């Protein structure tokens, strides 16, 4: 499901290198998390959702990654029944599932009552696949936590009553945006355009590393364990082996979501009885009057590529 712009994910549109001071990578931690299981975005001709799931799981296993949470929209299994096996594959691989709501509604554009119903509708599916495992993690669709402070606080109380924790996002590079153009380029058999996508995707990942690390150090004087937002798309599956190598080469170690969010930075995401904290690096930078790193335009026009 395609995302839309939001304060917390403004960095998703940064697919070129940022004009900020390059920070040399040291041994650093990152937790991969995956949204929109079991089906995300367009499929290239000849590829299935199961193919995508198998490639993602194989790449993570080959890299000896710890279990990565997949956040589920149950409606996708209903709309595309052939995608449903991806959920069992994910579990068979030892990877956990969390709640991304049933149909991906944006809390900022829906009533609390409607959004809560959609959240709870997803729970039987999660219980089916997770059993006694910890599925009480919520990834807000569109990362919308409520357009007002009052609404955000009310929803946090509701989530606390249902024993949820928030799966935060502290690094992202707009991976979702590459899946539709990839399907178009495959249909046109345009190898040159696909090669451009490959390069732009990896460049965007590098830019996001610099962007997030720059803000973390400006705010706190040091790195934190980052939580990376990814999507279960076909292009993501194509690129994952190279992406994992990129992070490793830049000094990152892979950890679980629980390990990353054990850092004090995330305490308000784990204990929803606490008052809401700034929900992004960007918001925290603005509140503290710090200068934001600059973000140039995309280096590739994803909307027109292979049209």
Question: What are the residue ranges of the model-derived segments?
Answer:
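Glycine-enriched alpha-helix->loop->beta-strand junction motifs that scaffold or abut catalytic
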Residues: 93-97, 160-165
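Bacterial N-terminal signal peptides that target proteins for export
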Residues: 1-12
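A short acidic, amphipathic alpha-helical/loop segment
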Residues: 85-86, 154-155, 242-243
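C-terminal domain-boundary segment and adjacent tail
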Residues: 61-64, 168, 222, 232-307
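Alpha-helical scaffold elements lining the catalytic groove of polysaccharide deacetylases
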Residues: 44-45, 79, 105-129, 148-162, ...
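Active-site beta->alpha N-cap acidic-glycine motif
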Residues: 26-143, 148, 228, 246
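Bacterial N-terminal signal peptides
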Residues: 10-21
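Short, basic, helix/turn surface patches
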Residues: 96-99, 125-133, 190-209, 278-298, ...
């Amino acid at each position: 499901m395609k995302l839309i712009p939001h304060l917390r994910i403004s960095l998703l549109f940064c697919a070129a290198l940022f004009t900020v001071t390059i920070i040399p990578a040291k041994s650093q931690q990152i937790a991969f998390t995956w949204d929109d299981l079991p089906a995300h975005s367009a499929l290239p001709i000849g590829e299935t959702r199961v193919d995508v799931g198998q490639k993602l799981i194989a790449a993570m296993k080959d890299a000896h990654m710890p279990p990565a949470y997949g956040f589920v929209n149950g409606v996708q299994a209903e709309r595309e029944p052939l995608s449903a096996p991806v959920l069992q594959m994910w579990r068979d691989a030892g990877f956990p599932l969390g709640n991304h709501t049933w149909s991906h509604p944006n809390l900022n554009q829906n009533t609390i009552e409607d959004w809560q119903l959609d959240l709870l509708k997803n729970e039987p599916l999660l219980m089916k696949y997770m059993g006694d495992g910890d599925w009480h993690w919520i990834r807000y669709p569109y990362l919308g936590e409520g357009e007002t402070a009052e609404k955000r606080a009310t929803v946090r109380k509701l989530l606390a009553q249902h024993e949820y924790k928030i799966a935060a996002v502290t690094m992202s590079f707009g991976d979702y945006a590459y899946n539709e153009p990839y399907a178009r380029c495959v249909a046109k058999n345009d190898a040159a355009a696909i090669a451009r996508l490959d390069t732009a995707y990896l460049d965007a990942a590098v830019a996001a590393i610099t962007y997030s690390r720059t803000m973390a150090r400006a705010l706190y004087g040091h790195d934190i364990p980052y939580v990376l937002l990814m999507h279960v798309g076909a292009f993501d599956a194509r690129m994952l082996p190279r992406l994992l190598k990129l992070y490793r080469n830049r000094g990152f170690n892979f950890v679980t979501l629980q390990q990353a969010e054990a850092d004090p930075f995330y305490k308000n995401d784990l204990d929803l009885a606490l008052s809401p904290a700034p929900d992004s690096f960007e918001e925290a930078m603005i509140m503290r009057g710090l200068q934001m790193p600059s973000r140039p335009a995309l280096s590739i026009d994803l909307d027109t590529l292979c049209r």
